[in-house]
């Protein structure tokens, strides 16, 4: 139970100390497991929700209230398992989630927060992604409060958990075009990074979509972080070394959207201009870069030959479609094969949109 108590103490102390502890002990997986066990004790079997690349999940009020934003399917569920002050607690959480900003990057706040989310006098993260009952975007607290009251009077639902406790919930749908609204939020950063590193902005946007669906809070089970799911000790360390920096980026650093996009794009630059620079055809290179972003350079070249120079020669001797076919069918990782297909499909289907609307 030590790590669970550590989690509680971390929540009530400076997060930088907790980040340091987790970094020094490689206790991330254990921390997640302990956290999940605690959630199961409170909410019941099959009720564990933990933040992921395309899911924002936050607990509050002694873990009895939680918010879940599913960025892939486009909905928000706010629920409580406690009947004590349930309307008050749900109302408060609805207001907080509608007005939260994308600067709430404290690592442990992705598990639990015991204070009100920071609400700044700036555009909320979900602005224009959620419309109220008058079909208007929500910017001010009184708008969020009014919408919360409407939802609680018309959309409140109740179900039973596996341990026969009542769970009260409100579901809010994001607008159908919620993805493009999130793209717009980070477009300037993507364009600046694209120009700085010479990486196609359509490729950057496609990778962000498949990695996180433009969820700035994204954290994976492998501890990949942020919009581009950068791993501190691999891509993060490589980029820092290229930039003449010591060590690796912190979690808080990578949970900043601008830092994350710059780091992820810098790594794409390293893949296309250093590690895979020997590939001549730009389309073949793009396929290799996409696959390597997910699985690493060695695994990509190893699909063609154990010898890297021979692998590059083989790639250069065949057509781009053949390169894609070999990577898609012969890469040893099913995840990497699927990743290449998804990123490439999104890239092809949206290239003209990215090139015209977002330039």
Segments from the language model and where they lie:
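Active-site metal-coordination segments of metallo-dependent hydrolases
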Residues: 178-181, 251-261, 334-335
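A short secondary-structure junction motif
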Residues: 170-172, 234-242, 300, 307, ...
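A short, mixed-charge helix-start or loop-turn motif at secondary-structure junctions
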Residues: 171-176, 246-253
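Secretory-pathway/luminal and periplasmic proteins that interact with or process carbohydrate-rich
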Residues: 212-221, 237, 295-307
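Catalytic and binding regions of secreted/periplasmic enzymes and modules that target cell-wall glycans
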Residues: 262-310
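Short, functionally critical alpha-helical segments immediately adjacent to catalytic or ligand/cofactor-binding
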Residues: 198-219, 230-231, 264-265, 289-294, ...
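Cell-wall glycan-active module
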Residues: 5-209, 217, 273, 277-280, ...
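Substrate-binding/active-site groove segments that recognize
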Residues: 221-248, 259-270, 317-318, 343
């Amino acid at each position: 139970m030590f790590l669970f108590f550590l989690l509680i103490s971390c929540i009530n102390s400076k997060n930088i100390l907790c980040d340091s502890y987790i970094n020094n002990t490689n206790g991330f997986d254990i921390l997640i497991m302990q956290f999940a066990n605690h959630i199961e004790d409170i909410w019941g079997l099959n009720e564990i929700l933990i933040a992921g690349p395309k899911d924002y999940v936050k607990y509050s009020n002694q873990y009895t209230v939680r918010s879940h934003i599913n960025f892939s399917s486009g909905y928000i569920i706010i629920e409580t398992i406690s009947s004590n002050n349930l309307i008050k607690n749900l109302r408060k959480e609805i207001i907080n989630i509608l007005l939260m900003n994308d600067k709430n990057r404290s690592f442990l706040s992705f598990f639990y927060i015991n204070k009100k989310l920071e609400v700044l006098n700036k555009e909320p993260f979900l602005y224009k992604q959620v419309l109220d009952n008058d079909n208007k975007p929500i910017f001010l607290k009184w708008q969020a409060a009014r919408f919360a009251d409407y939802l609680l009077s018309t959309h409140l639902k109740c179900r039973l958990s596996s341990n026969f406790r009542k769970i009260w919930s409100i579901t809010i749908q994001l607008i159908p075009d919620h993805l493009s609204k999130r793209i717009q939020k980070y477009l300037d950063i993507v364009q600046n990074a694209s120009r700085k590193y010479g990486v196609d902005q359509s490729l950057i946007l496609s990778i962000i979509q498949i990695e996180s669906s433009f969820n700035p809070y994204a954290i994976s089970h492998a501890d990949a972080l942020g919009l581009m799911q950068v791993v501190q000790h691999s891509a993060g360390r490589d980029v820092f070394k290229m930039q003449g920096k010591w060590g690796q980026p912190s979690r808080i650093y990578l949970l900043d959207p601008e830092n994350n996009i710059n780091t992820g794009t810098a790594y794409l630059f390293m893949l296309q201009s250093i590690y895979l620079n020997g590939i001549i055809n730009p389309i073949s290179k793009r396929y290799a870069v996409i696959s390597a972003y997910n699985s690493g350079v060695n695994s990509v070249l190893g699909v063609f030959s154990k010898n890297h120079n021979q692998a590059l020669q083989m790639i250069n001797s065949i057509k781009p479609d053949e390169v894609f076919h070999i990577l898609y069918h012969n890469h040893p990782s099913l995840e990497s094969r699927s990743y290449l297909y998804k990123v490439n499909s999104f890239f092809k289907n949206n290239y003209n949109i990215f090139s015209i609307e977002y330039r």
